[in-house]
């Protein structure tokens, strides 16, 4: 699956076409169904506006919201999103009470002049995800013929298909892979994701550095395996580093997290790194705590002394930060997935902040810095650094699967240039 040769919205003639766009409007709602964060809606505006400005007859938007488990549930209606979208676009938005069916087709086919239509939640139909849950919460597979019918129903609403929902790209859902139109292109959000991940995974400027944090080695094994033949250096940080330190150097780690299953593959990882001439950088000092809490009694430990029993490492120390900064400054492409410490608790946020500062400095001086979604994207947002980095991925699970070398069904389904 090449990331760099997929058709984009800018390659397609939209004039007088019904443009069917899969967006991600899975926004948080409060008890009164008020949207508490409209970031995802704002993120889709460039694609929606481009379709309107380039002469689309109708702009048909489809999305999921929450987990209604294949049944209509007013709690998960996209209706509040239609109101918010009208405000943001300063343009009327027609809300269709169903995402498929005769009435919806009539609304879409009547539309002219770039009319925006928002369809009701795709996941009100079991055929979107391919399954639903019964009263006992057991998964019930959707009927194959009904899935086909549902996909035909979506296909009937457009002349051109645009996918701008990267966060769902790792799911083979009907709206991601089942729309059968001659041209299937990425919207601006997906286009940017693909461009940047291609810059890292297909043609990186070197030296190429990956910074990997996280709790368990065993959770990141596919990621490490896929990146080792591609990178020049690898910083292993976060709780996962303790499994490396104890296994490789017999460092005392006290009550820090130790991944028994992961420890068995540490040797193989180091071996593979040597074979690929990859420099592995591990932390050398730690900020410790007697409990996992902001008001914990804190301490400091080095490799030589180790972490005493009753204490656990919740962040890395200044010497480690200096090592990271030096490695980051040498790199031309930096991919960061996983923070060095428990940044949610202020006493253990120092290394994360300083690593972020170094990443920002690298981006400002011309390196490509990509944040691979999840917790690290939260870090970038928390400290207001998103605009200062090359790219912050919006897809948690999708980014991870891409970095693990897996094919993303939603990307794979797009037309090639």
UniProtKB/Swiss-Prot annotation:
The modification Phosphoserine is found at residue 203. (2R)-3-phosphoglycerate binds at residues 23-26, 39-40, 63-64, 66-67, 122-123, 170-171. Dephosphorylated by PTC1 and PTC2 at Ser-203; the protein is cytosolic when dephosphorylated. One of its GO terms (cellular component) is mitochondrion. Its cofactor is Mg(2+). Keywords: ATP-binding, Cytoplasm, Glycolysis, Kinase, Magnesium, Metal-binding, Mitochondrion, Nucleotide-binding, Phosphoprotein, Transferase. GO terms for molecular function: ADP binding; ATP binding; metal ion binding; phosphoglycerate kinase activity. It is found in: Cytoplasm, Cytosol; Mitochondrion. Its main location: cytoplasm. Disruption phenotype: Decreases cytosolic pyruvate levels and increases mitochondrial acetyl-CoA levels. Increases production of aflatoxin and increases the mumber of cellular autophagic vesicles. ATP binds at residues 215, 220, 239, 313, 344, 375-376. Pathway: Carbohydrate degradation; glycolysis; pyruvate from D-glyceraldehyde 3-phosphate: step 2/5. Mg(2+) binds at residues 215, 219, 375. Its EC number is 2.7.2.3. One of its GO terms (biological process) is gluconeogenesis. Coiled coil: none annotated. HAMAP family: Phosphoglyc_kinase. Monomer. PANTHER family: PHOSPHOGLYCERATE KINASE. Belongs to the phosphoglycerate kinase family. This is Phosphoglycerate kinase. It comes from Aspergillus flavus (strain ATCC 200026 / FGSC A1120 / IAM 13836 / NRRL 3357 / JCM 12722 / SRRC 167).
């Amino acid at each position: 699956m090449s990331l760099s040769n997929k058709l984009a919205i800018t390659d397609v003639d939209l004039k007088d076409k019904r443009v069917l766009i899969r967006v991600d409007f899975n926004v948080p709602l409060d008890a009164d169904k008020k949207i508490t964060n409209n970031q995802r809606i704002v993120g889709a505006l460039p694609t929606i506006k481009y379709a309107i400005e380039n002469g689309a007859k109708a702009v048909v938007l489809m999305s999921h919201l929450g987990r209604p488990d294949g049944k209509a549930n007013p709690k998960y209606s996209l209706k509040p999103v239609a109101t918010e979208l009208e405000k943001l676009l300063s343009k009327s938005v027609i809300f269709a009470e169903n995402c498929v069916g005769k009435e919806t087709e009539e609304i879409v086919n009547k539309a002219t002049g770039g009319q925006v239509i928002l369809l009701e939640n795709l996941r009100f139909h079991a055929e979107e995800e391919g399954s639903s849950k019964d009263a006992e919460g057991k998964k019930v597979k959707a009927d194959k013929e009904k899935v086909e019918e549902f996909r035909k129903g979506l296909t009937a609403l457009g002349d051109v298909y645009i996918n701008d929902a990267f966060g769902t790209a790792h799911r083979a859902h009907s709206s991601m892979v089942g729309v059968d139109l001659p041209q299937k292109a990425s919207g601006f959000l997906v286009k940017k994701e693909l461009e940047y991940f291609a810059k890292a995974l297909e043609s990186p400027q070197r030296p190429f550095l990956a910074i990997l944090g996280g709790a368990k080695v065993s959770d990141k094994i596919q990621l490490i395996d896929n990146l080792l033949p591609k990178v020049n250096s690898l910083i292993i940080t976060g709780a996962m580093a303790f499994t490396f330190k104890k296994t490789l150097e017999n460092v005392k780690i006290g009550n820090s997290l130790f991944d028994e299953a992961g420890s068995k593959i540490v040797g193989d990882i180091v071996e593979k790194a040597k074979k690929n001439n990859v420099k592995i950088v591990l932390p050398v000092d730690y900020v410790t705590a007697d409990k996992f809490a902001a008001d914990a009694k804190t301490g400091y430990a080095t490799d030589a002394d180790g972490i005493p029993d009753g204490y656990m490492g919740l962040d890395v120390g200044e010497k480690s930060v200096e090592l990271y900064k030096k490695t980051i400054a040498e790199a031309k492409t930096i991919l960061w997935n996983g923070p060095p410490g428990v940044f949610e608790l202020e006493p253990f946020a120092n290394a994360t902040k300083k690593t972020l500062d170094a990443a920002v400095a690298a981006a400002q001086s011309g390196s490509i810095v990509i944040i691979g979604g999840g917790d690290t994207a939260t870090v970038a947002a928390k400290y207001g650094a998103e605009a200062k980095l090359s790219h912050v991925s919006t897809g948690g699970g999708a980014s991870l699967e891409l970095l693990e070398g897996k094919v993303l069904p939603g990307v794979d389904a797009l037309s090639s240039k």
